[in-house]
Structures are given as structure tokens and as C-alpha cells.
Amino acid sequence: MAVHEELPVVVVGAGPVGLAAAAHLLERGIEPLVLEAGASAGSAVAAWGHVRLFSPWRYDVDAAARRLLEATGWTAPDPDALPTGAELVERYLTPLAATPQIAARLRTSSRVVAISREGADKTRSLGRERLAYRVRVQGPDGATHHVRARAVLDASGTWGQPNPVGTGGLPAFGEVGSSVVTGPLPDVLGADRALFAGRRTLVVGMGHSAANTLLSLVELARDEPGTRIAWAVRGGSPRRLYGGGTDDELPARGLLGTRLRDAVESGLVTLATRTSIERIEPVGPSGGTWDVGAAGTSDVPTAPGPVRVQGTTRDGELDLEVDTVVGATGFRPDLDMLREVRLDLDPVVESPRALADLIDPNHHSCGTVPPHGEALLAHPDTGFYVVGMKSYGRAPTFLLATGYEQVRSIAAALAGDREAADLVQLDLPATGVCSSDLALDPVSGEVAEVSCCGTSPAAAEPVLVTFGAPAGSLGFATGTAHGRSADEQEDPR
């Protein structure tokens, strides 16, 4: 039986999944309260506004949200068009947040800093399920207050929690606070151009965010002499990222891998495999400061001095002088605010335990993750759910449409409609469309999202290239076999 029905369901985050949750709750007659840390809905999406999704609009708009919007006279975008992050905000999230139903229940500049049961820490069990949730919120003036809730959906995402570039999941010495290390999606050809033009960049990471940045740098190098590019991956080779080429079901994804392979084999990009980065230290006096945020954007048009990146690679010692390091190493969930909530998390992926085997990137790509709903997302504290990208923990296989289905199912469960909650369905292409994977548009050169799913062709022969310098000066050996697929076959020692 539901308790505290007079209280709202707090939704943490006003991104696509958070706003979809509010829409589904409203359709079920349940009062939502959406708390967004940013100044407006979709703040995290706006941070990568220059990125074009590969998933067309038909998969980017939630059904309940669409019904709210259509009641206002909203005109839906072309279902087959590919939006940028900025367009997703402008044409979907902003109008959705402005609907009378959502606007009255949305609080921006309201950062959730802690969640607990009212009057009970994590250790208290007696009567726990009858207690309301207590959500501690930091407002725009820095003051904190509490909001009482009957249930909580944490849709805060992972954008502000990038993985470090250092080895073993820990920041390299000198990494924390370094103005040289950017976030995963800098606007190489736009706002952040001065940070990369005519300079030496090391990109660290094995996903499509890394590939997108690398290809943008290759394009920049055509116009800006002296632009040099190195790429470090932790795995044995990039075979999986190269994908299926012309055999790929999604042409833009296949083209992404083909372009990247060509850039490596031609020597435009220097690849180091089995890379462990231990230290990042300044070289000489700094040439200025660059305040780089999570998206790699900056308000200061000067760049820092060079750094020396040290560690090891498959071929031996790594000792590389660069001007910028792009950390495209993925994300992890921020669990600090959930310390007083009883969670059942998988120790590897940091997703709900029941979901972990379905999304583990060692075994699954986005197209092989089955639809799932409330039953797999529940935690020991009844009425608390982590949804959206954060529900996948460290797994990069999240689909935006999957998040919409998650919150539809949870809203049904909170309304007492068990049958609807358990009837989980998802309409997607056979290959899936991963919301976190990115590529370059084959015609315009703009950034476009791609699926994470693909075939893995046989590795090509290794090629020796250098980092825009005389042969032998850096001498990274390159290969074409990928990350975790290779890790499964090779002992990391």
C-alpha cells in the first residue's frame, strides 16, 4: 500500500529522462517535483550542444512528453532528422519544461546534495518503509533546505563525473586540478579551437567520444599547421571501435571507424595501446590559464603551457610532451548523495544488481541489452530508483529510449498498476541507438551520434607512426585490435 500519497515524487534532474519521468507521473495522477542543478532544463545536454546525435528524432522524444507538448500546439521535428544537443534542448526539452504542467513543478538551480529516510539513517530498519524520503537541496543562494517525498527517482546522469585518465581508476599524479586536462567532448572546431590549433593533443579513451574528438582534430590539422595528435587506449587495440566498415548496419557508424582507422594508418594519429598513465606534470612556465569545464568549453582565450605525460604502453615507457590532454574515458555515477539510501548495486558496474548482467560492457553492446523496467531497477529502500544514464553505472551501453521505458514502468508501479509496470516494451532498430556514442556526419563533418553496436573485423597489420615529428622521436606502435574485446583475450600483465 502506498504511503505518504500527499507528498510529491521527487525527480532529480531535468534532462530527457527526468522530464519524461515527470510526464509519465502526471499521466498517472501522481504529483512530481523536478529538481535541476543547472539554471535551466537540459543543462547537461546543452554542455555538449555542438554534438549531433545519430539517433533520429523519432527515438529522442518520449511518448508521454509528446502528448504534453502536442496539447500546446508544439510542432514535432522531422522524425528522421538528426538533432544536435543544442537542438534537442531548444526544440524539445525547453518547450517541454515550459508546458504549464511541468513548469509549475520544476525547480532549477536546485542541486540535490543528499537523500535519506526521514529521521532515520541507513542502519535503522524498524518502520523504515513507512518513512518519507528527505531530500536535501542546495538552492541558487547556496542555502540548503529539505524536501519531503513519497518516492525519489534519481535521473541526475553521469555528465559531471568523468573517469580519470590515470591508471587503475585513480587520477594520475598531477591530473586533479590540471588546466591541461579537458572533459570528454571539447568543441575542437568551435568554441575550444584555440586550445587545439597548432598544438599537441593527447586523447585518452576508447569510446566514440574519443573517436569523434580525434576526427575533429584531424580536420583541424588540415587547416592549422603544427596540430599534432596522439591517442592512448588502455586496451590491446581499437578493433571494436573500428567496427564493421562498409558492412555496418548504420553507415555513419561504419564510416566513423573507417575514418579513424585511416587516420591511424596514415600517421595523422599516433596510437599507443595498453597505456597506463601515471603522472602529468608541467614543463616550464605556464603560458596562461584555461578554465575547462566538463564539456571542455572555456571562457579564457589563452592556453596553458605544456605538460609531460608519463607512464607505460605495450611497447615500454611513455614519456610524451603535449599541450592538451582530452580525457574521453567514460563516466561513473556520483553515489555520494546516496550514502544514506539502502542500495543494491553491482560491485563491478555500479548499476542495480539485477540489471548488471544485462548491461555489462564486457558482454553486451547497446543492441543486445533487453528492455527492462521497475522490477530490475528497485532497491532495498522501497520507492527509490536510479534511472537514465546513471542507472547503467559505469556501463556505456545506455539508450535514451531505454530510459524513457524505465520511467514509464516506474510510474505505473508507483500508481499501483503492476501489470503495466511489468509489460516492458521497447521499439528500436535491431542495432540499437546508443545515446552516449558519437560520430562525425559523413557529409557535413558535424558531430553525430552513432550506435555502440557493431561487428569486429579482423585486425590489420600494425603500423609504426610518429607524433608529427621525425621518425623515431616518439615511435608509438599502432594496431587495430580494440579495448575490452582484446582485454578478454589478453592478460593485462
Residue ranges and their predicted role:
Residues 2-44, 50, 81-435:
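Flavin (primarily FAD) cofactor-binding/catalytic cores of flavoenzymes
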Residues 438-493:
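Long, low-complexity intrinsically disordered regions
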Residues 51-75, 124-129:
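Flavin (FAD/FMN) cofactor-binding and adjacent substrate-gating region
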Residues 63-65, 430, 442:
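Juxtamembrane/interface motifs at transmembrane-helix termini
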Residues 53, 69, 73, 365-366, ...:
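Short alpha-helix boundary/capping motifs
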